[in-house]
């Protein structure tokens, strides 16, 4: 366990450091940040025949953290004092995911094929809280001769954010086939249907903290489910063993959520389409790729306003396009 030290404080008015040793702590030596991560992962492969096999997998991840700190909010070089906020927070996230697919290699006439079909599922459970961040110390600390008192966070929270949560479940079903028409020309295509169910929101600490419009029980700012069929298509043509051109088209579907910010209307999933075309050169010494891309998204969420007036809105479409160049090589042995 290491003491959590944020270091010295930057004076925002002058963009300079206070005239004290940089090693001097203005928070508290008992600041604490701890985290624990557990991971379980296993895969099974079963050969059905010479050209077919069955794959299955499961993974579990858990992440827990806790922090307790005195956070510097202001340094007054004239009075030689620093003001700090005493905060405490903990969180727990668990992710279960599993997959099952079948892979087959076969020929249709002179065309070799690699076929994949499967299903995957994921459950993500994230709980944050309790969060105590309402306590400012009554007395400031002297920056020249600090007296560390090991303060404890006051167990109160009056803004309705003491507990935050996001529960997400997804299921995907997919098929994909890669066809080798010749040694030089390869095409791949696939379909994927993805479904999600999501609940996210917040509530306050207890009845005494709940103000008008705040919730003591779990009520979601986001409570939704949806699904969509997605397409993917790609092609590669090799002019020589070292030079190839390629083109790819794909679609995306991503659920969005709001924990603390009210949502204006329905928070629809973000959807995207991307297209890329380019050329690639590769030999034993280096490889280079030049590509043009175009990415468009719709149902993009954006926070409008601030503080108590903040609201999450769907702002419409976004588009990005450009040129990408990548070069990798081995300079020496």
How does the language model describe each region?
Residues 1-47, 60-93, 136-166, 170:
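Acidic/polar loop-and-plug regions of large Gram-negative outer-membrane beta-barrel proteins
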Residues 64, 112, 116-240, 262:
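Signature of Gram-negative outer-membrane beta-barrel scaffolds
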Residues 37-43, 51-105, 168-203, 228-254, ...:
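Surface-exposed extracellular loop regions of Gram-negative outer-membrane beta-barrel proteins
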Residues 2-17, 36, 67-73, 128-134, ...:
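Outer-membrane beta-barrel translocator domains and adjoining extracellular loop/strand segments
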Residues 34-38, 92-96, 167-171, 225-229, ...:
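Residues that define the transmembrane beta-barrel architecture of outer-membrane proteins
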Residues 25-30, 39, 43, 83-89, ...:
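Extracellular loop and loop/strand-boundary signature of outer-membrane beta-barrel proteins
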């Amino acid at each position: 366990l290491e003491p959590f030290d944020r270091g010295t404080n930057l004076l925002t008015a002058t963009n300079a450091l206070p005239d004290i040793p940089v090693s001097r702590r203005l928070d508290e030596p008992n600041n604490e940040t701890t985290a624990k991560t557990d991971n379980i992962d296993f895969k099974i492969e079963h050969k059905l025949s010479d050209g077919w096999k069955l794959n299955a997998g499961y993974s579990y991840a858990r992440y827990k953290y806790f922090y307790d700190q005195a956070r510097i909010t202001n340094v007054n070089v004239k009075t030689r004092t620093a003001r700090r906020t005493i905060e405490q927070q903990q969180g727990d996230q668990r992710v279960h995911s599993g997959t099952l697919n079948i892979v087959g290699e076969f020929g249709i006439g002179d065309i070799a094929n690699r076929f994949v079909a499967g299903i995957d599922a994921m459950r993500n459970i994230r709980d944050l809280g309790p969060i105590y961040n309402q306590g400012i110390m009554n007395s400031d600390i002297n920056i020249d001769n600090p007296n560390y008192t090991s303060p404890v966070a006051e167990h109160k929270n009056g803004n309705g954010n003491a507990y935050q949560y996001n529960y997400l479940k997804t299921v995907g079903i997919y098929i994909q086939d890669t066809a080798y028409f010749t040694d030089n020309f390869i095409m791949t295509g696939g379909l994927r249907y993805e479904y999600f169910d999501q609940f996210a929101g917040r509530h306050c600490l207890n009845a005494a903290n709940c103000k008008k419009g705040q919730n003591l029980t779990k009520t979601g700012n986001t409570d939704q489910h949806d699904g969509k069929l997605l397409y993917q298509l790609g092609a590669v043509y090799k002019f020589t063993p070292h030079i190839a051109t390629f083109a790819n088209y794909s679609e995306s579907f991503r659920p969005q959520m709001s924990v603390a910010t009210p949502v204006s209307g329905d928070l629809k999933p973000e959807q995207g389409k991307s297209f890329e075309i380019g050329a690639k050169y590769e030999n034993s010494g280096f490889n280079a790729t030049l590509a043009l891309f175009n990415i468009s998204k719709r149902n993009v969420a954006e926070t409008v306003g601030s503080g108590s007036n903040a609201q999450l809105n769907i702002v419409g479409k976004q588009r990005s396009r450009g040129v990408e160049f990548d070069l990798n090589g081995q300079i020496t042995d």
